[in-house]
Amino acid sequence: MLQLTAVGQRYGDHRVLHDITLTVPAGQLLCVVGPSGCGKSTLLRTIAGLLPAREGTVTVDGAPVTGVPDSLAVVFQDYGRSLFPWLTVRDNVALPLRRRGLARAERRAEADRILDRVGLSGAAHRHPWQLSGGMQQRVAIARALVCRPTLLLMDEPFGSLDAQTREDLEDLLLEVHRTDGTTIVFVTHDIDESVYVGDRVVVLSPGPGSRIVRDLPVRLPGRRDQIATRGLPEFVALRAEVGRAVRSREAE
């Protein structure tokens, strides 16, 4: 379980986040949306331990976050810069396992297992610069999953991809969540995406001093489908509710 209690964050005299209190149960996929510049990425980096909370506390499974927990993985939007161009796809994915001291054969087997899962088994010997943007992001996701994290943080991971590739990766994320039960915090600027992939959507107010203004459960019937789900009355209504919350002066 992830717990944030009265978390505040600032850069010098500039307050970014104010009084963020949030509980994310184990196995939940939480989406965070809000206006540009409201501190969504700062919130994610604070959860990850990359930025110490200036106020309040962050705990994962009851333990205070004082650095990046071993049970946590992060996927950023800028997949191109997160991969090492001189390493093969397999070696990029296996890198966290090397740091954990696994033998070469074990690293290779685990990397191949996860590459097959994300649909890249035929690209193991290639290098990142030989791949499309969508394939590079699949590599980044595979590298995050290879250590079997209990908490996965994703910072607008599909924001720079074309629509078809984004939909494919949204469905991959849902499959991973459904199969592994990983707790996921997913930051996005795309309201439709938040409703489609999320179990719950949290809306942040504009900055400075962003706070949570809406906390909405996502209750959609049936298994998610890119065409059928987006046409459901429940989807349309919730999308409108999230959109109003993001744009409303109530959030200011």
Region annotations inferred by a language model:
Residues W86-A94:
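Short coil-to-helix segment of the ABC ATPase nucleotide-binding domain corresponding to the Q-loop/switch region
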Residues A48:
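Helix-to-loop junction immediately C-terminal to a conserved catalytic motif
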Residues V33-P35:
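The feature captures the beta-strand-to-loop junction immediately N-terminal to the Walker
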Residues R126-W129, C147:
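Conserved signature/switch motifs of ABC ATPase nucleotide-binding domains
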Residues G56-V68, E110:
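Conserved ABC transporter NBD signature motif
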Residues L152-D155:
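Catalytic Walker B motif of ABC-type/P-loop ATPase nucleotide-binding domains
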Residues R98, A105-A123, E175:
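Conserved ABC ATPase "signature" region
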